[in-house]
Structures are given as structure tokens and as C-alpha cells.
Amino acid sequence: MAGLKQHSGLVVPLDAANVDTDAIIPKQFLQAITRVGFGKHLFHEWRYLDAEETQLNPDFVLNFPQYQGATILLARKNLGCGSSREHAPWALADYGFKVMIAPSFADIFYNNSLNNHMLPIRLSEEEVEEIFQWVWANEGKQIHIDLEAMTVTVGDKIYRFELDEFRRHCLLNGLDNIGLTLQHEDAITAYESKIPAFLR
């Protein structure tokens, strides 16, 4: 898995608070247990005019022409509230999002996002409002995320964010739980060699 050190991308301004996981990926799409294929169902109720997903809703921001190809989601407070379904970050990642910016995230959603190699950035409500205003006034322009410096550059302004050092290390180096375990493969092998045969 590639590390996420820096990222420049287009921003989708989702001007809504308390966006829950059922809005992100409705329950009827949760049958699969692999991480791919959920992007087309992202924000199903808002994004489409029909249950078969054949008609896009032209009034939903994700469908606006100027935001096609966006990789950064900007939202209001309490993003990802509701049930703990891991399919929510799967759907966001499968659509192409790599970074989310909001004043706050639901705890389980926040951790699930990090576990799925997405970067949720918490900024103050005032800072998020400033970014909304900039995005609306500068359609088509990208912003820059620097995880090494822990900064968000929007136009000529720099915002600083915080992230647990362990989580930062994992994202920078592209490590998931398996990757972390394999970093200690030699120590694990050495320990296993000392275990009595009847316990193996």
C-alpha cells in the first residue's frame, strides 16, 4: 500500500452537518464484504433520482461538473455519525476520496477511515467555513495536504491540523494492521522458534 505523504486535489463542498453512515452508504448495499464496488452507491439517496441509479440528481453537489474527479471531501461537523458500518469509508475510498476535512467526525467512522488509509482532518468550524468560502469562490482549483508537515494549504493560507503520531506513521508508510505485524516478522519467528513443539 502506497504511503500518503502529500496530496493535492479538487474539493467537493458538502454543505451539511451530521451526515450519517446511512446517507453515505445505505443499508441495502451492505451485503458485500470486499472493499471495492461501493463507490457507485455513495450518497445513493442524494446522488440519484431513482432506486436503480440510472438518473443522476443534478442538484446534488457530487454531480456538479466542476467537482468531477474530486479527491477531498469537505463537510460540516459530526461527519460519519450513526451506525458503525465500515462500508462507509469503503464507499468514500472506492469513489476516489483520499482526504476528508470537517470540524468533527464520529469516533468509529474516524478510526475506520484511518484503518482504510483515508485521512480525516479536523479543523475548527471557523477554519472549515473559510475553506468552504474559498472553494465556492475558486471552482476548479486544488488544495494541498502535507501529512509530513501536517498542514492544509488553501490558496495563500496554511491551516495546521493534528494527528496521533502512530496513525500518522501508518499513513505515511502505507501500513495497515497486516503491514504493521510484518514489520516484526523476525521477532515473531524468533519467538515461535522458542515455543516447545507440543505447543505449536
Swiss-Prot record:
CDD domains: IPMI_Swivel. Its EC number is 4.2.1.33. Pathway: Amino-acid biosynthesis; L-leucine biosynthesis; L-leucine from 3-methyl-2-oxobutanoate: step 2/4. Signal peptide: none annotated. It comes from the Bacteria. Belongs to the LeuD family. LeuD type 1 subfamily. This is 3-isopropylmalate dehydratase small subunit.
